[in-house]
Protein backbone atom coordinates (compact mmCIF):
# COMPACT_ATOMS: atom_id res chain seq x y z
CA UNK A 1 0.00 0.00 0.00
CA UNK A 2 1.43 3.36 -1.00
CA UNK A 3 0.77 5.73 1.92
CA UNK A 4 2.67 8.61 0.32
CA UNK A 5 0.00 8.99 -2.36
CA UNK A 6 -2.51 9.94 0.34
CA UNK A 7 -0.40 12.46 2.29
CA UNK A 8 0.48 9.83 4.85
CA UNK A 9 3.70 10.19 6.80
CA UNK A 10 5.44 6.77 6.94
CA UNK A 11 7.56 7.94 9.90
CA UNK A 12 4.46 7.77 12.07
CA UNK A 13 3.18 4.39 13.07
CA UNK A 14 -0.31 3.17 12.23
CA UNK A 15 -1.51 3.44 15.77
CA UNK A 16 -0.66 7.17 15.86
CA UNK A 17 -3.08 7.72 12.97
CA UNK A 18 -5.91 5.64 14.47
CA UNK A 19 -6.22 7.19 17.95
CA UNK A 20 -9.03 9.60 18.96
CA UNK A 21 -10.87 9.53 15.64
CA UNK A 22 -14.33 11.01 15.12
CA UNK A 23 -16.61 10.42 12.16
CA UNK A 24 -18.81 12.75 10.09
CA UNK A 25 -22.27 11.31 9.44
CA UNK A 26 -22.78 13.59 6.39
CA UNK A 27 -19.79 11.92 4.62
CA UNK A 28 -21.18 8.38 4.87
CA UNK A 29 -23.15 8.68 1.65
CA UNK A 30 -20.03 9.93 -0.16
CA UNK A 31 -17.93 7.08 1.23
CA UNK A 32 -20.65 4.58 0.27
CA UNK A 33 -20.62 5.91 -3.30
CA UNK A 34 -16.84 5.63 -3.33
CA UNK A 35 -16.91 1.91 -2.41
CA UNK A 36 -19.85 1.09 -4.69
CA UNK A 37 -18.02 2.58 -7.70
CA UNK A 38 -15.35 -0.16 -7.63
CA UNK A 39 -15.76 -3.83 -8.55
CA UNK A 40 -15.22 -6.59 -5.95
CA UNK A 41 -12.00 -8.09 -7.24
CA UNK A 42 -8.30 -8.07 -6.44
CA UNK A 43 -7.63 -4.84 -8.35
CA UNK A 44 -10.42 -2.79 -6.60
CA UNK A 45 -10.37 0.19 -9.00
CA UNK A 46 -13.00 2.06 -6.96
CA UNK A 47 -10.66 2.26 -4.00
CA UNK A 48 -7.56 3.35 -5.93
CA UNK A 49 -8.58 6.89 -6.86
CA UNK A 50 -6.32 9.78 -7.66
CA UNK A 51 -4.85 12.11 -5.12
CA UNK A 52 -7.18 14.93 -6.20
CA UNK A 53 -10.33 12.89 -5.50
CA UNK A 54 -8.93 11.77 -2.16
CA UNK A 55 -8.25 15.39 -1.19
CA UNK A 56 -11.84 16.37 -2.10
CA UNK A 57 -13.26 13.64 0.13
CA UNK A 58 -11.01 14.60 3.05
CA UNK A 59 -11.01 18.35 3.59
CA UNK A 60 -10.50 18.26 7.34
CA UNK A 61 -6.92 18.36 8.55
CA UNK A 62 -5.22 17.78 11.84
CA UNK A 63 -5.56 20.66 14.34
CA UNK A 64 -2.74 23.01 15.03
CA UNK A 65 -2.26 21.79 18.57
CA UNK A 66 -1.88 18.11 17.71
CA UNK A 67 1.46 16.44 18.29
CA UNK A 68 2.38 12.86 17.43
CA UNK A 69 5.21 10.84 18.85
CA UNK A 70 6.39 7.99 16.66
CA UNK A 71 7.74 6.16 19.69
CA UNK A 72 4.73 6.36 21.98
CA UNK A 73 2.14 6.35 19.19
CA UNK A 74 -0.16 8.94 20.91
CA UNK A 75 -1.75 12.26 19.83
CA UNK A 76 -2.58 15.22 22.02
CA UNK A 77 -5.88 16.35 20.44
CA UNK A 78 -8.79 18.38 21.70
CA UNK A 79 -11.88 16.34 22.42
CA UNK A 80 -13.99 18.43 20.04
CA UNK A 81 -11.62 18.37 17.05
CA UNK A 82 -12.68 16.21 14.10
CA UNK A 83 -10.59 15.15 11.11
CA UNK A 84 -10.72 12.52 8.38
CA UNK A 85 -8.23 9.80 7.47
CA UNK A 86 -6.81 9.23 4.02
CA UNK A 87 -9.13 7.36 1.67
CA UNK A 88 -7.43 4.01 2.13
CA UNK A 89 -7.69 4.36 5.93
CA UNK A 90 -11.06 6.10 6.15
CA UNK A 91 -14.07 4.92 8.07
CA UNK A 92 -16.73 2.67 6.66
CA UNK A 93 -20.46 2.77 6.61
CA UNK A 94 -21.72 0.65 9.45
CA UNK A 95 -25.19 0.34 7.91
CA UNK A 96 -26.39 -2.91 6.35
CA UNK A 97 -23.61 -4.97 7.91
CA UNK A 98 -24.28 -8.67 7.12
CA UNK A 99 -24.81 -11.19 9.84
CA UNK A 100 -22.15 -13.55 11.10
CA UNK A 101 -23.21 -16.50 8.93
CA UNK A 102 -23.26 -14.32 5.78
CA UNK A 103 -19.86 -12.84 6.65
CA UNK A 104 -18.36 -16.29 7.11
CA UNK A 105 -19.80 -17.33 3.73
CA UNK A 106 -18.35 -14.24 2.07
CA UNK A 107 -14.97 -14.84 3.69
CA UNK A 108 -14.97 -18.46 2.52
CA UNK A 109 -15.89 -17.44 -1.02
CA UNK A 110 -13.18 -14.79 -1.09
CA UNK A 111 -10.57 -17.31 0.03
CA UNK A 112 -11.68 -19.85 -2.57
CA UNK A 113 -11.60 -17.22 -5.30
CA UNK A 114 -7.99 -16.30 -4.48
CA UNK A 115 -8.52 -13.12 -2.51
CA UNK A 116 -5.45 -11.36 -1.25
CA UNK A 117 -4.71 -9.87 2.09
CA UNK A 118 -5.34 -6.37 0.68
CA UNK A 119 -8.99 -7.31 0.07
CA UNK A 120 -9.49 -8.11 3.74
CA UNK A 121 -7.61 -4.96 4.72
CA UNK A 122 -9.87 -2.70 2.64
CA UNK A 123 -13.17 -4.59 2.96
CA UNK A 124 -15.50 -2.94 5.49
CA UNK A 125 -17.30 -6.20 6.15
CA UNK A 126 -14.13 -7.93 7.24
CA UNK A 127 -13.13 -4.95 9.37
CA UNK A 128 -16.52 -5.10 11.09
CA UNK A 129 -16.49 -8.90 11.61
CA UNK A 130 -14.77 -8.98 14.97
CA UNK A 131 -15.57 -5.40 16.12
CA UNK A 132 -18.77 -6.03 18.07
CA UNK A 133 -19.28 -6.25 21.76
CA UNK A 134 -21.41 -8.82 23.58
CA UNK A 135 -24.63 -6.85 22.89
CA UNK A 136 -24.05 -6.86 19.12
CA UNK A 137 -23.05 -3.19 18.93
CA UNK A 138 -20.00 -2.33 16.83
CA UNK A 139 -16.97 -1.23 18.75
CA UNK A 140 -14.52 1.38 17.63
CA UNK A 141 -12.61 -0.35 14.80
CA UNK A 142 -9.79 2.13 15.05
CA UNK A 143 -9.16 1.24 18.69
CA UNK A 144 -8.69 -2.41 17.71
CA UNK A 145 -6.18 -1.32 15.07
CA UNK A 146 -4.22 0.74 17.60
CA UNK A 147 -2.47 -2.45 18.77
CA UNK A 148 -0.57 -2.61 15.48
CA UNK A 149 3.09 -1.63 15.62
CA UNK A 150 5.15 0.52 13.31
CA UNK A 151 6.63 -2.63 11.77
CA UNK A 152 3.22 -3.49 10.30
CA UNK A 153 3.25 -0.46 7.99
CA UNK A 154 6.69 -1.40 6.71
CA UNK A 155 5.81 -5.05 6.05
CA UNK A 156 2.34 -4.39 4.58
CA UNK A 157 3.51 -5.36 1.10
CA UNK A 158 4.77 -8.74 2.32
CA UNK A 159 1.47 -9.24 4.17
CA UNK A 160 -0.46 -8.38 1.00
CA UNK A 161 1.35 -11.07 -0.94
CA UNK A 162 1.02 -13.69 1.80
CA UNK A 163 -2.30 -15.05 0.46
CA UNK A 164 -2.14 -17.20 -2.65
CA UNK A 165 -5.10 -18.26 -4.81
CA UNK A 166 -6.49 -21.73 -4.13
CA UNK A 167 -5.91 -22.97 -7.68
CA UNK A 168 -2.29 -21.82 -7.46
CA UNK A 169 -1.86 -23.77 -4.21
CA UNK A 170 -3.33 -26.86 -5.90
CA UNK A 171 -0.96 -26.47 -8.84
CA UNK A 172 1.98 -26.13 -6.46
CA UNK A 173 0.93 -29.30 -4.61
CA UNK A 174 0.63 -31.20 -7.90
CA UNK A 175 4.06 -29.94 -8.94
CA UNK A 176 5.48 -31.10 -5.63
CA UNK A 177 3.93 -34.57 -6.11
CA UNK A 178 5.31 -34.79 -9.64
CA UNK A 179 8.74 -33.67 -8.49
CA UNK A 180 8.69 -36.28 -5.71
CA UNK A 181 7.76 -39.01 -8.21
CA UNK A 182 10.52 -37.90 -10.56
CA UNK A 183 13.01 -37.92 -7.69
CA UNK A 184 11.90 -41.43 -6.66
CA UNK A 185 12.23 -42.66 -10.27
CA UNK A 186 15.69 -41.12 -10.48
CA UNK A 187 16.67 -42.80 -7.21
CA UNK A 188 15.45 -46.18 -8.51
CA UNK A 189 17.38 -45.76 -11.74
CA UNK A 190 20.48 -44.74 -9.82
CA UNK A 191 20.20 -47.81 -7.58
CA UNK A 192 19.79 -50.10 -10.62
CA UNK A 193 22.81 -48.51 -12.29
CA UNK A 194 24.87 -48.88 -9.11
CA UNK A 195 23.98 -52.59 -8.88
CA UNK A 196 24.88 -53.10 -12.54
CA UNK A 197 28.16 -51.25 -12.02
CA UNK A 198 29.02 -53.47 -9.06
CA UNK A 199 28.30 -56.59 -11.16
CA UNK A 200 30.52 -55.32 -13.96
CA UNK A 201 33.31 -54.51 -11.52
CA UNK A 202 33.14 -58.01 -10.03
CA UNK A 203 33.28 -59.54 -13.52
CA UNK A 204 36.27 -57.40 -14.45
CA UNK A 205 38.02 -58.39 -11.22
CA UNK A 206 37.44 -62.10 -11.86
CA UNK A 207 38.74 -61.77 -15.42
CA UNK A 208 41.85 -59.96 -14.19
CA UNK A 209 42.47 -62.75 -11.68
CA UNK A 210 42.12 -65.34 -14.44
CA UNK A 211 44.57 -63.42 -16.63
CA UNK A 212 47.08 -63.26 -13.79
CA UNK A 213 46.73 -67.00 -13.18
CA UNK A 214 47.29 -67.82 -16.87
CA UNK A 215 50.30 -65.50 -16.99
CA UNK A 216 51.75 -67.28 -13.96
CA UNK A 217 51.29 -70.70 -15.57
CA UNK A 218 52.83 -69.50 -18.83
CA UNK A 219 55.83 -67.99 -17.03
CA UNK A 220 56.40 -71.20 -15.07
CA UNK A 221 56.40 -73.30 -18.25
CA UNK A 222 58.68 -70.83 -19.99
CA UNK A 223 61.13 -70.87 -17.09
CA UNK A 224 61.14 -74.67 -17.04
CA UNK A 225 61.91 -74.86 -20.75
CA UNK A 226 64.62 -72.22 -20.46
CA UNK A 227 66.29 -74.10 -17.61
CA UNK A 228 66.10 -77.37 -19.52
CA UNK A 229 67.64 -75.83 -22.63
CA UNK A 230 70.37 -74.21 -20.55
CA UNK A 231 71.19 -77.52 -18.84
CA UNK A 232 71.41 -79.34 -22.15
CA UNK A 233 73.66 -76.62 -23.58
CA UNK A 234 76.01 -76.80 -20.61
CA UNK A 235 76.23 -80.61 -20.55
CA UNK A 236 76.79 -81.09 -24.27
CA UNK A 237 80.54 -80.40 -23.94
CA UNK A 238 81.09 -82.92 -21.16
CA UNK A 239 82.37 -86.21 -22.62
CA UNK A 240 80.47 -89.31 -21.68
CA UNK A 241 82.19 -91.95 -19.61
CA UNK A 242 83.16 -95.07 -21.48
CA UNK A 243 83.02 -98.46 -19.76
CA UNK A 244 84.45 -101.64 -21.07
CA UNK A 245 81.93 -104.41 -21.05
CA UNK A 246 82.82 -107.52 -19.14
CA UNK A 247 81.26 -109.82 -21.70
CA UNK A 248 79.45 -109.89 -25.02
CA UNK A 249 76.14 -110.47 -23.26
CA UNK A 250 76.34 -107.09 -21.54
CA UNK A 251 77.12 -105.39 -24.85
CA UNK A 252 74.16 -107.10 -26.45
CA UNK A 253 71.77 -106.06 -23.69
CA UNK A 254 72.89 -102.42 -23.86
CA UNK A 255 72.50 -102.32 -27.61
CA UNK A 256 69.07 -103.86 -27.44
CA UNK A 257 67.90 -101.39 -24.77
CA UNK A 258 69.20 -98.43 -26.75
CA UNK A 259 67.52 -99.76 -29.87
CA UNK A 260 64.23 -100.11 -28.05
CA UNK A 261 64.51 -96.50 -26.75
CA UNK A 262 65.29 -95.20 -30.23
CA UNK A 263 62.31 -97.03 -31.70
CA UNK A 264 60.07 -95.59 -29.02
CA UNK A 265 61.39 -92.09 -29.68
CA UNK A 266 60.85 -92.58 -33.39
CA UNK A 267 57.22 -93.58 -32.81
CA UNK A 268 56.69 -90.49 -30.68
CA UNK A 269 58.19 -88.24 -33.34
CA UNK A 270 55.93 -89.79 -35.96
CA UNK A 271 52.90 -89.10 -33.79
CA UNK A 272 54.05 -85.54 -33.19
CA UNK A 273 54.59 -85.07 -36.89
CA UNK A 274 51.09 -86.26 -37.65
CA UNK A 275 49.66 -83.97 -34.98
CA UNK A 276 51.64 -81.06 -36.38
CA UNK A 277 50.36 -81.73 -39.86
CA UNK A 278 46.83 -81.94 -38.52
CA UNK A 279 47.31 -78.67 -36.63
CA UNK A 280 48.56 -77.02 -39.78
CA UNK A 281 45.49 -78.23 -41.63
CA UNK A 282 43.18 -76.98 -38.88
CA UNK A 283 44.87 -73.64 -38.19
CA UNK A 284 47.68 -72.56 -40.51
CA UNK A 285 48.29 -69.25 -38.65
CA UNK A 286 50.06 -70.53 -35.54
CA UNK A 287 52.40 -68.24 -33.63
CA UNK A 288 56.15 -68.89 -33.58
CA UNK A 289 57.72 -69.37 -30.13
CA UNK A 290 61.35 -69.25 -29.01
CA UNK A 291 61.73 -72.97 -28.40
CA UNK A 292 59.64 -74.24 -31.27
CA UNK A 293 56.68 -73.29 -33.34
CA UNK A 294 54.30 -75.92 -32.04
CA UNK A 295 53.42 -77.20 -28.61
CA UNK A 296 52.34 -80.80 -28.37
CA UNK A 297 49.88 -80.20 -25.53
CA UNK A 298 48.16 -77.26 -27.20
CA UNK A 299 47.99 -79.19 -30.48
CA UNK A 300 46.48 -82.18 -28.69
CA UNK A 301 43.95 -79.94 -27.03
CA UNK A 302 43.02 -78.40 -30.36
CA UNK A 303 42.69 -81.83 -31.93
CA UNK A 304 40.44 -83.07 -29.16
CA UNK A 305 38.23 -79.99 -29.46
CA UNK A 306 38.09 -80.39 -33.21
CA UNK A 307 37.17 -84.06 -32.93
CA UNK A 308 34.41 -83.25 -30.46
CA UNK A 309 33.00 -80.67 -32.86
CA UNK A 310 33.14 -83.17 -35.71
CA UNK A 311 31.37 -85.85 -33.68
CA UNK A 312 28.63 -83.39 -32.71
CA UNK A 313 28.19 -82.40 -36.33
CA UNK A 314 27.99 -86.05 -37.33
CA UNK A 315 25.32 -86.68 -34.71
CA UNK A 316 23.30 -83.72 -35.93
CA UNK A 317 23.63 -84.89 -39.53
CA UNK A 318 22.52 -88.39 -38.51
CA UNK A 319 19.49 -86.96 -36.74
CA UNK A 320 18.63 -84.87 -39.77
CA UNK A 321 19.02 -87.88 -42.06
CA UNK A 322 16.88 -90.01 -39.78
CA UNK A 323 14.24 -87.31 -39.65
CA UNK A 324 14.36 -86.96 -43.44
CA UNK A 325 14.10 -90.72 -43.93
CA UNK A 326 11.13 -90.94 -41.55
CA UNK A 327 9.45 -88.10 -43.36
CA UNK A 328 10.20 -89.77 -46.69
CA UNK A 329 8.55 -93.01 -45.54
CA UNK A 330 5.55 -91.06 -44.23
CA UNK A 331 5.21 -89.29 -47.58
CA UNK A 332 5.40 -92.62 -49.44
CA UNK A 333 2.71 -94.09 -47.17
CA UNK A 334 0.44 -91.11 -47.72
CA UNK A 335 0.88 -91.40 -51.50
CA UNK A 336 0.10 -95.12 -51.39
CA UNK A 337 -3.03 -94.47 -49.32
CA UNK A 338 -4.15 -91.83 -51.78
CA UNK A 339 -3.61 -94.20 -54.73
CA UNK A 340 -5.58 -96.92 -52.94
CA UNK A 341 -8.49 -94.53 -52.38
CA UNK A 342 -8.48 -93.50 -56.04
CA UNK A 343 -8.45 -97.14 -57.17
CA UNK A 344 -11.31 -98.01 -54.83
CA UNK A 345 -13.34 -95.12 -56.18
CA UNK A 346 -12.71 -96.28 -59.75
CA UNK A 347 -13.67 -99.85 -58.86
CA UNK A 348 -16.87 -98.65 -57.20
CA UNK A 349 -17.77 -96.54 -60.24
CA UNK A 350 -17.12 -99.51 -62.60
CA UNK A 351 -19.21 -101.84 -60.48
CA UNK A 352 -22.06 -99.31 -60.48
CA UNK A 353 -21.76 -98.99 -64.27
CA UNK A 354 -21.84 -102.77 -64.74
CA UNK A 355 -24.84 -103.08 -62.44
CA UNK A 356 -26.70 -100.44 -64.44
CA UNK A 357 -25.91 -102.30 -67.71
CA UNK A 358 -27.12 -105.63 -66.32
CA UNK A 359 -30.36 -104.04 -65.11
CA UNK A 360 -30.90 -102.48 -68.54
CA UNK A 361 -30.33 -105.87 -70.25
CA UNK A 362 -32.83 -107.54 -67.95
CA UNK A 363 -35.40 -104.86 -68.74
CA UNK A 364 -34.87 -105.37 -72.48
CA UNK A 365 -35.22 -109.15 -72.12
CA UNK A 366 -38.49 -108.84 -70.24
From Swiss-Prot:
The record's region (Disordered) falls at: 28-47, 60-85
**Carries keyword Nucleus?**
yes
Cell location: Cytoplasm; Nucleus, Nucleolus
Question: Which keywords accompany this UniProt record?
Answer: Cytoplasm, Meiosis, Nucleus, Sporulation
UniProt subunit comment: Component of the MIS (mRNA N6-methyladenosine (m6A) methylation) complex, at least composed of IME4, KAR4, MUM2, SLZ1, and VIR1. Interacts with VIR1.
Protein family per UniProt: Belongs to the fl(2)d family.
Name of the protein: Protein MUM2
Species, as recorded: Saccharomyces cerevisiae (strain ATCC 204508 / S288c) (Baker's yeast)
Q: What is the lineage of its organism?
A: Eukaryota, Fungi, Dikarya, Ascomycota, Saccharomycotina
Q: Which gene encodes it?
A: MUM2
